[in-house]
């Protein structure tokens, strides 16, 4: 279902996924929004779809346990919205999603209070499901793409802290939604792979804060949409896990090796079950990347896993 340093080192060839056993967890869901909130030092999850309806609950994870936050007001129930942390304003930005309608509202999460605030902007991207939100190498949150119910988008926007401003790079990736995207903090490069489009985009793009570059990788994952990507400081690489591919959900783990401009599949001693639409984030409290939720076929998941290199 779809709704620092420039030096690099080679990532190891193997790693292990370990399932965590927190005392409580959010209910099962897929196509949730999830990111690390640097202000509160916690991972935040919002919304998703549980097989019967859209969700609008907020949860945080401190490296040990999940906690439900009864926030009011709150964004409306939705799936396939996206979030990213704005280090300038120290707020989490949430945009878009789908709940029977395509959504174009902007919400800010203050994890220190904690509360949500709806921002009534003068300008905004189109109302879309599956936009790609990411911290840009210049320190702002950028948005690319999404699907508005008729067309896949290829516009790019930047959050100023109070409004959206459109960016016009000389080249942009092909239009798409629900791609896996993450920023490599060790290289200052954004990495984007896959997604949904009129023609399945089996390609890798990188962005340095000014220019998008289509990479000619010698090896790469299968085409996936709703895959989960995050930067892992332990590997100094962007990790890509899972995703849907032609109706078959995946559970492979890949890393983008920037110096070689190539993907490498990691041999994992254990792996979460296949899934699409899962949340992923690097959790400094654990010191590892974690994955939560998603769906495997019609099975909706609420398990939490950490990746140990």
Enumerate the predicted regions with their spans.
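Secretory targeting and sorting signals
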Residues: 1-10
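Kelch-like beta-propeller repeat domains
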Residues: 11-309
